[in-house]
Amino acid sequence: MPQLDTSTWSITITSVVLTLFIMFQLKILKSSFPNNPEPKSTPMLKTSMPWEKKWTKIYLPLSLPQH
Protein backbone atom coordinates (compact mmCIF):
# COMPACT_ATOMS: atom_id res chain seq x y z
CA MET A 1 0.00 0.00 0.00
CA PRO A 2 1.35 3.42 -0.87
CA GLN A 3 1.96 5.90 1.89
CA LEU A 4 -0.51 8.80 2.01
CA ASP A 5 1.24 12.14 1.60
CA THR A 6 -0.10 14.49 4.29
CA SER A 7 2.47 17.26 3.89
CA THR A 8 0.05 19.59 2.07
CA TRP A 9 -2.90 19.01 4.40
CA SER A 10 -2.04 21.79 6.82
CA ILE A 11 -1.84 24.47 4.12
CA THR A 12 -5.02 23.15 2.49
CA ILE A 13 -7.01 23.20 5.73
CA THR A 14 -5.66 26.64 6.62
CA SER A 15 -6.56 28.09 3.24
CA VAL A 16 -10.07 26.57 3.35
CA VAL A 17 -10.72 28.00 6.81
CA LEU A 18 -9.42 31.41 5.78
CA THR A 19 -11.52 31.41 2.61
CA LEU A 20 -14.66 30.44 4.51
CA PHE A 21 -14.00 33.12 7.09
CA ILE A 22 -13.60 35.80 4.41
CA MET A 23 -16.71 34.63 2.58
CA PHE A 24 -18.83 34.75 5.72
CA GLN A 25 -17.47 38.18 6.62
CA LEU A 26 -18.43 39.50 3.20
CA LYS A 27 -21.86 37.92 3.46
CA ILE A 28 -22.47 39.50 6.85
CA LEU A 29 -21.15 42.85 5.62
CA LYS A 30 -23.73 42.96 2.83
CA SER A 31 -26.68 42.24 5.11
CA SER A 32 -28.39 45.21 6.70
CA PHE A 33 -29.49 45.40 10.30
CA PRO A 34 -31.60 48.07 12.00
CA ASN A 35 -29.40 50.75 13.52
CA ASN A 36 -31.26 51.42 16.73
CA PRO A 37 -34.16 49.15 17.53
CA GLU A 38 -36.69 51.06 19.60
CA PRO A 39 -39.18 49.32 21.88
CA LYS A 40 -42.79 49.82 20.95
CA SER A 41 -44.56 52.24 23.20
CA THR A 42 -47.70 50.69 24.55
CA PRO A 43 -50.35 53.03 25.93
CA MET A 44 -50.61 52.73 29.66
CA LEU A 45 -54.17 52.07 30.75
CA LYS A 46 -54.95 53.64 34.08
CA THR A 47 -56.57 51.13 36.35
CA SER A 48 -58.35 52.49 39.37
CA MET A 49 -57.35 50.97 42.64
CA PRO A 50 -59.87 50.51 45.47
CA TRP A 51 -58.02 52.94 47.73
CA GLU A 52 -58.07 55.64 45.03
CA LYS A 53 -61.87 55.82 45.12
CA LYS A 54 -62.00 56.75 48.80
CA TRP A 55 -61.10 60.12 50.20
CA THR A 56 -58.15 59.87 52.54
CA LYS A 57 -56.97 62.54 54.88
CA ILE A 58 -53.40 63.60 54.35
CA TYR A 59 -51.64 64.74 57.48
CA LEU A 60 -48.97 67.37 57.30
CA PRO A 61 -45.78 66.74 59.23
CA LEU A 62 -45.67 68.30 62.66
CA SER A 63 -44.41 71.84 62.49
CA LEU A 64 -42.48 73.59 65.21
CA PRO A 65 -44.50 75.96 67.36
CA GLN A 66 -44.14 79.53 66.20
CA HIS A 67 -43.03 82.05 68.83
Swiss-Prot record:
It holds the Pfam family ATP-synt_8. InterPro entries: ATP8_mammal, ATP8_metazoa. GO terms for biological process: proton motive force-driven ATP synthesis. It is a single-pass membrane protein. The modification N6-acetyllysine is found at K54, K57. The keyword Acetylation applies. It comes from the Eukaryota. It is found in: Mitochondrion membrane. GO terms for cellular component: mitochondrial membrane; proton-transporting ATP synthase complex. The chain crosses the membrane at residues 8-24. Keywords: Acetylation, ATP synthesis, CF(0), Hydrogen ion transport, Ion transport, Membrane, Mitochondrion, Transmembrane, Transmembrane helix, Transport. Subunit 8, of the mitochondrial membrane ATP synthase complex (F(1)F(0) ATP synthase or Complex V) that produces ATP from ADP in the presence of a proton gradient across the membrane which is generated by electron transport complexes of the respiratory chain. ATP synthase complex consist of a soluble F(1) head domain - the catalytic core - and a membrane F(1) domain - the membrane proton channel. These two domains are linked by a central stalk rotating inside the F(1) region and a stationary peripheral stalk. Component of the ATP synthase complex composed at least of ATP5F1A/subunit alpha, ATP5F1B/subunit beta, ATP5MC1/subunit c (homooctomer), MT-ATP6/subunit a, MT-ATP8/subunit 8, ATP5ME/subunit e, ATP5MF/subunit f, ATP5MG/subunit g, ATP5MK/subunit k, ATP5MJ/subunit j, ATP5F1C/subunit gamma, ATP5F1D/subunit delta, ATP5F1E/subunit epsilon, ATP5PF/subunit F6, ATP5PB/subunit b, ATP5PD/subunit d, ATP5PO/subunit OSCP. This is ATP synthase F(0) complex subunit 8. It comes from Ailurus fulgens.
